[in-house]
């Protein structure tokens, strides 16, 4: 009978129990399973009794204290394989991570690509599950009935439903509702404090001694007065010592709830299912007394109906002080989620989700958090810093779209002043000149690989230098290395071997030298390096080394050695051209003057123009690191501002979705691929900036749109809007100083990399295999594209003149000046 009675009452309680409520009652001490009372065979492996065991963790067999068996440690190859599969999102145990990716995807889509379908939109509006809450165990909410707050919960760590996605700021004091109802949790809850302030723990002797010593050193009284405590700095959160565990008597709780008056209108909406929704404990300490209409006189009632401008609630000294401003807390704790497919651009384009979306996709959005945009902030800081340093070091070039010409009277080789012109390309970005940008690390093909055209130009200059000689002025004003046609037959004497006192090349045969002479350099007088066997200087002045030490200076008896030299090599321009001229002319032309050399063949002008690290072989440029170094440079202030705006909107938004590692890989590889293509098709144009990287990020938006196609309400409208933005940017790239080639190939590489690295929502089990195939195909195509560009750049260079029209349209004759090899442009 007792068992039947017990079973009957249990069934009645089971019928009244809410469907989602689970209550675990521990067994009575005397009714434990005898199997659990038996000692273990290996007491060494018993768990400590001082640790609190979590509920629901006991195995079915009743062996709660038995540890699981030992497992073999996974090998390094298996760990790498599993980690790689998880990173690409194709592992077998990736279900939880996939749900997080898909929740974040919907958040991003709702902000970037427009309105979603209604079922996806409802899933986004569900409360977040980031923090522990009992909302998942509540019964379904009834319509047109407000939630009832239990006044007897007394500070349990529950939160309001509308608080879950907001910062954890203290609540405004709410009056207790349903004062006559007493819940079971009210008698057993700890960490209480609903009706009174929790007591403070005593300070330790060490803490009080340290505080007294600090007070004596600072000259303050040891015992604080109430006034000094009041003047101290307040805190918005109480110390942990205030939150000691103490059980409050139920009668005291009933008293506090009984004297809390509420309106009877709220009493009629009491529901047992919502009794667990209680305000946070901080709300109970600052409740302002509410006016009771039946106890107030008529004048007071009229005054109470007027709007209250400001209410100041007095709080005692022992309670917490001033709170942090709500604006500061919202700024500090605000972590807005990014909906997949609805990011910043989606909010600009007014995208939404569609209505018909399966519940499987909705369930994937519940644990989807946004990443911190560390890479966006870092790259923006680096861009701003480098731009400031570049402008401070090299200054600002003439502003405009055409060429800038400067004229000035400059002392030339013949000792007379001549009017010379200096032509340079204008920069409308408000920044350094192209020479300065090349020196800083701009993308410039002659500095990256061996260029056949530049090599032919240098060989042509060396051929002319072999026929040169020393032109000595008859008035003994000086001498200069030049050609016969540039030396006056009346006012000067042209010294050329073997016509004028040529030295002997071979002592055995008596053959004399035919290449020379060279002003201020002769094999007979140079001692370092000396022209002796077996290191005799060749009969070709273009192969002579620089003489670092002369035995006799001005009294050798050799005419081209005793004269005063007027010109030395000067590297001018960006193509490695060299002239023997004066220092004044070299400075005016923004060249590099070599005081130690006497011939242009003794200097390597291309190494001087490129700067940075010297070439391993001066004849073969090898600065391939310019392909990614130029991503951190900008052509000017406006260029940098455009990049900052793009990175603070699009880049930061995408990084919140995919994380810094995936976005940084796409950013860097897209930029390198774009610069590689630009170096191939536009070899003689100095380009800087992350143009390819930015268009690679725009390709990420397209991939995200394609993967969110099934959940968007109007996907074609979002696609056309995004396509219009990209086409406008491509048309804008037809202006000079904007690299459209880097835009195109950066977009293609970003498209391929996004299919491999970006997460996206899956619609069924077949999507897993589809994603694996997509990753493999995308990576293979990207590797093939990158390898083809490298081979074309270093092995089989391509020179297509028509491709320049893709990056600049010549609206005028000088709007897009060609950077061919024959022009001396800067």
UniProtKB/Swiss-Prot annotation:
Pfam (any one): Rhomboid
Keywords from the named record: Cell membrane, Endoplasmic reticulum, Growth factor binding, Membrane, Protein transport, Transmembrane, Transmembrane helix, Transport
GO cellular component, one term: plasma membrane
Topology class, membrane: Multi-pass membrane protein
Major place of residence: endoplasmic reticulum
Record carries keyword Ribosomal protein: no
Region annotation Disordered: where it falls in the sequence: 1-38, 51-78, 153-180
GO biological process terms held by the UniProt record: negative regulation of protein secretion; protein transport
Keyword Membrane: yes
Basic and acidic residues bias locations: 159-168
A Gene Ontology molecular function term of the record: growth factor binding
Matches recorded under InterPro entries: Inactive_Rhomboid, iRhom1_2_N, Peptidase_S54_rhomboid_dom, Rhomboid-like_sf
Job description of the protein: Regulates ADAM17 protease, a sheddase of the epidermal growth factor (EGF) receptor ligands and TNF, thereby plays a role in sleep, cell survival, proliferation, migration and inflammation. Does not exhibit any protease activity on its own.
PANTHER family per UniProt: INACTIVE RHOMBOID PROTEIN (PTHR45965), INACTIVE RHOMBOID PROTEIN 2 (PTHR45965:SF2)
Stated family: Belongs to the peptidase S54 family.
Protein name: Inactive rhomboid protein 2
Organism classification: Eukaryota, Metazoa, Chordata, Craniata, Vertebrata
Gene of this entry: rhbdf2
């Amino acid at each position: 009978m007792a068992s039947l009675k017990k079973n009957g009452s249990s069934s009645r309680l089971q019928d009244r129990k809410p469907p989602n409520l689970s209550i675990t009652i521990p067994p009575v001490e005397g009714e434990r399973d005898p199997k659990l009372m038996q000692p273990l065979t290996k007491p060494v492996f018993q768990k400590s009794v001082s640790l609190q065991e979590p509920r629901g963790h006991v195995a079915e067999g009743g062996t709660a204290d038995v540890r699981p068996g030992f497992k073999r440690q996974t090998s390094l190859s298996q760990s790498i394989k599993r980690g790689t599969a998880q990173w690409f999102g194709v592992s077998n145990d990736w279900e939880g991570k996939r749900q997080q990716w898909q929740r974040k995807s919907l958040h991003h889509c709702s902000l970037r690509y427009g309105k979603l379908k209604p079922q996806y939109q409802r899933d986004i509006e569900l409360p977040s599950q980031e923090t522990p809450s009992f909302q998942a165990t509540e019964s379904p909410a009834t319509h047109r009935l407000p939630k009832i707050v239990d006044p007897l919960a007394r500070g349990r760590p529950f939160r309001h439903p509308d608080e879950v996605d907001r910062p954890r700021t203290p609540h405004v004091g709410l009056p207790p509702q349903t004062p006559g109802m007493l819940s079971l949790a009210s008698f057993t809850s700890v960490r209480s404090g609903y009706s009174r302030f929790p007591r403070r723990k005593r300070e330790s002797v060490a803490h009080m001694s340290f505080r007294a010593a600090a007070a004596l050193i600072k000259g303050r009284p040891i015992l604080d007065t109430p006034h000094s405590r009041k003047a101290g700095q307040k805190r918005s959160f109480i110390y942990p010592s205030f939150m000691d565990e103490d059980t409050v008597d139920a009668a005291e709780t009933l008293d506090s709830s009984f004297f809390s008056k509420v309106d009877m209108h709220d009493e009629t909406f009491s529901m047992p299912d919502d009794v667990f929704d209680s305000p946070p404990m901080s709300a109970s300490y600052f409740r302002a007394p509410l006016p009771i209409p039946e106890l107030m006189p008529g004048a007071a009632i009229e005054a109470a109906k007027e709007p209250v401008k400001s209410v100041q609630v007095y709080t005692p000294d022992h309670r917490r002080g001033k709170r942090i401003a709500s604006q500061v807390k919202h700024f500090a704790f605000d972590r807005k989620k990014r909906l997949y497919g609805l990011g910043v651009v989606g909010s600009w384009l007014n995208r939404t989700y569609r209505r018909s979306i399966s519940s499987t996709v909705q369930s994937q959005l519940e644990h989807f958090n946004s990443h911190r945009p560390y890479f966006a902030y870092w790259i923006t800081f680096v861009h701003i810093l480098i731009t400031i340093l570049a402008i401070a070091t090299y200054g600002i070039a003439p502003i405009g779209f055409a060429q800038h010409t400067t004229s000035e009277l400059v002392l030339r080789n013949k000792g007379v002043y001549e009017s010379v012109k200096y032509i340079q390309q204008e920069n409308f970005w408000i920044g350094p000149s192209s020479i300065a940008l090349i020196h800083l690390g701009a993308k410039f093909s002659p500095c990256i690989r061996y260029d056949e055209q530049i090599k032919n130009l240098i060989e042509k200059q060396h051929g002319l230098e072999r026929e040169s000689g020393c032109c000595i002025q008859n008035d003994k004003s000086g001498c200069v290395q030049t050609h016969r046609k540039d030396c006056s037959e009346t006012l000067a004497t042209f010294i050329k071997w073997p016509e004028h006192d040529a030295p002997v090349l071979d002592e055995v045969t008596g053959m004399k030298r035919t290449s020379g002479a060279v002003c201020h350099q002769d094999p007979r007088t140079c001692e370092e390096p000396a022209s002796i066997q077996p290191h005799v200087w060749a009969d070709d002045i273009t192969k002579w080394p620089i003489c670092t030490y002369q035995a006799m200076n001005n009294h050798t008896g050799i005419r081209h050695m005793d004269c005063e030299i007027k010109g030395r090599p000067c590297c001018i321009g960006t193509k490695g051209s060299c002239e023997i001229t004066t220092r004044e002319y070299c400075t005016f032309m923004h060249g590099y003057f070599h005081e130690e050399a006497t011939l242009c063949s003794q200097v390597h002008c291309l190494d001087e123009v490129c700067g940075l690290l010297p070439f391993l072989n001066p004849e073969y440029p090898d600065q391939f690191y310019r392909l990614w170094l130029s991503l951190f440079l900008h052509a000017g202030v406006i260029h940098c501002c455009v990049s900052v705006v793009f990175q603070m909107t699009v880049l930061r938004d995408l990084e919140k979705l995919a994380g810094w590692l995936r976005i940084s890989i796409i950013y860097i590889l897209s930029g390198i691929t774009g610069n590689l293509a630009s170096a191939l098709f536009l070899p003689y144009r100095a380009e800087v900036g992350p143009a390819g990287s930015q268009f690679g990020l725009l390709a990420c938006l397209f991939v995200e749109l394609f993967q969110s196609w099934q959940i968007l309400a109007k996907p074609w409208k979002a696609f056309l809007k995004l396509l219009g933005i990209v086409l406008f940017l491509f048309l804008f790239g037809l202006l000079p100083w904007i690299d459209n080639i880097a835009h195109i190939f950066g977009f293609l590489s970003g498209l391929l990399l996004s299919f491999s690295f970006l997460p996206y929502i899956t619609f069924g089990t077949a999507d897993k295999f589809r994603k694996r195939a997509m990753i493999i195909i995308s990576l293979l195509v990207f590797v093939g594209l990158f390898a083809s560009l490298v081979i074309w750049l270093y092995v089989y260079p391509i020179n297509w003149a028509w491709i320049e029209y893709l990056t600049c349209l010549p609206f005028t004759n000088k709007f897009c000046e060609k950077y061919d090899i024959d022009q001396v442009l800067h």
